[in-house]
């Protein structure tokens, strides 16, 4: 039996089979979980096609985390497939073009607000939408995907600020929902060549930094180590870990300039 045997997991953010979210869903299934995916808008048809590449094709529910109606009906839709949730994966992030690329001082509030709403506040929104489904006596684990926000990265700009907000949001959720045995942890992955990464100006600069400085060899085309960490955090191996950031970045976060 796998480490997620008998567990039900909701995974957001699956868009291509190169994404970390896809590999979380794949590894979770291989470890025994039943997986439900979310997507929305024009991406729905893409996610449904990609779902067929999983070991077991997973249902895809529509969810825009900025849409209150979608959030309100999420638990009802999930119950059509599984009776409860043991794990939730937050793989959601977006910043308008004006909030990236070295334009930090000139970015206007509406663009900043969009980045923070979609990338950070949505962790709280998604959690509260799923909370009625966290009924297992063993509690539930919410895992988010992060990019280290301890430092200011070139051209990452307001997305870096949004990731810092995500990290803080995770800690406050861990504080407030720990008494209900709901855990919150983030996986801070190194750069991975995903569709989302392609939209970040200067992504190649991240790759060169990792190639030259990370103690462990880093492969920007391999999302599996980050996916395995996320799955482990939803397993019985981490029942007393919450409010934590697990770095899966080849160790670069620990190295000075």
Regions found by a protein language model. Give the residues of each.
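Hydrophobic structural elements of the Rossmann-like NAD(P)H-binding subdomain
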Residues: 11, 89, 143, 184-187, ...
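C-terminal helical subdomain
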Residues: 121, 179, 186, 205-241, ...
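Catalytic loop of short-chain dehydrogenase/reductase
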Residues: 13-22, 93-131, 135-179, 191-194, ...
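Rossmann-fold cofactor-recognition segment
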Residues: 51-69
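Short-chain dehydrogenase/reductase
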Residues: 75, 123, 127, 170-171, ...
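A glycine/serine/threonine-rich, flexible loop-to-helix segment
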Residues: 50, 158, 179, 191-215, ...
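Conserved Rossmann-fold cofactor-binding substructure of NAD(P)-dependent oxidoreductases
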Residues: 66-81
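Canonical Rossmann dinucleotide-binding motif of NAD(H)/NADP(H)-dependent dehydrogenases/reductases
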Residues: 2-37
